[in-house]
Amino acid sequence: MILITGASGNVGREVVKQALAVGLKIRATFQSPAVAAKAPAGLEGVIMDYAKPETIRAALHGVEKIFLVAPPVRDLPALEANFVKEVRAAGRKHIVKLSALGGRESMFPSGHRDSEENIEASGLPYTFLRPNGFMQNLVNYNAGTIRSQNAFYGCQGNGAVSIIDIRDIAAAAVIVLAATGHEGKSYALTGGESLINEQIAEKISRVAGRKISYVDLPAAELKKGILSTGTSEWSADALIDLQRLYCEGKASLVTDDVERLTRHKPIAFDQFARDYAFAFQDEAKVAS
């Protein structure tokens, strides 16, 4: 039995989909019964709260491997530490942790490093998957202004990023979960090319059928816009700090880890843009 945490999130949902497609026996965790009720057929859904050890213990019963993904919040290391404590008590189970590319130089990956070090110290078998930024973030966070303003915003200047399609992250995760030989290893998961936002805007323009622009803003102005969406202060600061990392060129690394794990090249941004073209349609035309 494989436990997939965060099954309603962007990556967790895709891991569930691909795990079911290859016939893996999985249990998936959800935050509420309402969300669990919408889970696909073929899996066992359970409610789990990282702050409630009894729910973690119930989720771990009979499990051999775990895909661990916690929400991107300030207390991520503490939440995952609670989980790891219960895993140790339940026996020697292999944790496949969704981490992040980068080190201590930025808030978000730094929290993942804390969690990784705790897992290493636990003595449990582990594998760390460290992806770069997600292509799908353009759909989740930027599609609204792309549709309504023909533009998306950031503060990363000309910093290039080897962004990766979530579908490739999930494919790598399923392979690690389904096989042995990955214990004690870390994989840096990136796309096959490093792109600046102007290049991304050009590629989206082609599938959208109109000109889409990238607008670079001062960090303070961008943060103000992020906060206006209801995002927490910490999350806004973490996003701005991550863009600083991008601006400094520290996220441009391209690796072959996706291809080595999955035996296929990473999904190209052009393919991603075609697959998600519906998300970038002109809002005025859709309304008419």
Task: Walk through the language-model features, giving the residues of each.
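Amphipathic terminal alpha-helices
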Residues: D257, K265-S288
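Conserved SAM-binding strand-loop segment of SAM-dependent methyltransferases
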Residues: E44-I47
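C-terminal accessory subdomains/tails of enzymes that are appended
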Residues: S194, K211, R260-T262, A287-S288
